[in-house]
Amino acid sequence: MAGRTFLLGICASALGLAASIPPQPTFYKNVLPVLQNRCQECHRPGEAAPMPFLTYQEARPWAKAIREAVVTRKMPPWPADPHFGKFRNDRSLSREEIDTIVAWADSGAQEGNPADAPKPAQFVDGWGIHKPDAVFEMPNEFAVPASGTIDYQYIVIPSGFTEDKWVDEYEARPGNRQVVHHIIAFVRPPGSKWLKDAQPGIPYVPVKEDREKRKQRRKDEDSGPPPELLVGFAPGLPPGTLRPGQAKLVKAGSDFVFQMHYTANGTAGLDRSRLGMVFAKQPPEERVYTASASNDKFEIPAGDANYEVESDITIQEQTLLVDLMPHMHLRGKDFVYTAFYPTGESEVLLRVPKYDFSWQLFYYLADQKVLPAGTRIHCVAHFDNSPNNPANPDATQTVRWGDQSWEEMMIGFFDVAMDRDKDPMDLFVEKKHGKSGD
């Protein structure tokens, strides 16, 4: 994993670079602005990247590796097709920025004059968001064994909120990145019957069920308010940050539920993950809600290199589209979101032609898009279950929906903004697809 992630953040535009590439760029004048503005968020102590790029002494040994990564566009991690959609968190480098880094590396990676350096970037220690107003941490460390399959662990943490809270920045952070595959932090509102047997602070594993028991449980859960996804942690996933006037709602008396996916790596470890959030300074005009178009009714045949799965969801009232995030596992190949409007027109919102499980990103629209009432979001994904997929755990197996990485998922997450007093449960109608070919 380190080989894929060591250059996380060599990305985006450098402020103040000259229109023409200087014949001998220097670190302080030409390269540091790129690292500082986009890269040091992760390339600093305690963050995702395994080495910091805060100083010349730290970055200089990696000059040739940085050059190779940006020339081949392996870095920055931005797999979206540039022909569809504009995104405010676009990490891709311009041609000029690439040429500047190449010229710097090829001319000996010169240090230059420290007086040319911009002021040091300011970060909140331990967070990718502003200083949190509230932090919720697992009450106890979870012991991850050195080997074996680890069931998803659900940990309920009461919010203690006595009044509704509006949240406009939020981040889930693993305590031990070596063993945490992903975190999903849910808000469980008062009256919810989801995971009703879980005790606060105690890791809970849902009981295995047959079809009838699962059907009855879901019917029971549907009689109460559903949980809402707040934020997740996964490789490459940035913290959640919303624009002014928009926020997510955490109702008074809610619980937070951490869904923890641990992966054994040959060495036993301990984890104590946490959730941080920044409260909106005033009630927002719009509530942001995470929805999804998913399909769990598929069977990917052994050896199939291009198996197609579709999902759809229709939006009943006008909303604003905030962001998109496709999710698959190791056999995921490509993913496309298309909006079908009630006028009969359609538009590709996002195309990820080379999906990479190691880089799961939210794509925040540069200009949030109006979705008229009756808009259908249609997702199409392809999976490569052939021996030619180097990430494939086993090309001889038929693959179905499942939590573990060697199983598969097909989920098109997206956030929408609506009037803050609207009930999001009234907004969506999801089409149920059968197996491909049905």
Residue ranges and their predicted role:
Residues 82-87, 117-166, 171-320, 326-438:
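Beta-strand-centric surfaces of beta-sandwich/beta-rich domains
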Residues 1, 16-22, 430-438:
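Basic/polar N-terminal segments that are highly enriched at the extreme N-terminus
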Residues 30, 323-324:
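Short, hydrophobic/aromatic alpha-helical segments in well-folded domains
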Residues 4-16:
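Bacterial N-terminal signal peptides
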Residues 16-161, 169, 253-259, 264-266:
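Aromatic- and Gly/Pro-enriched helix-to-coil junctions and flexible linker segments
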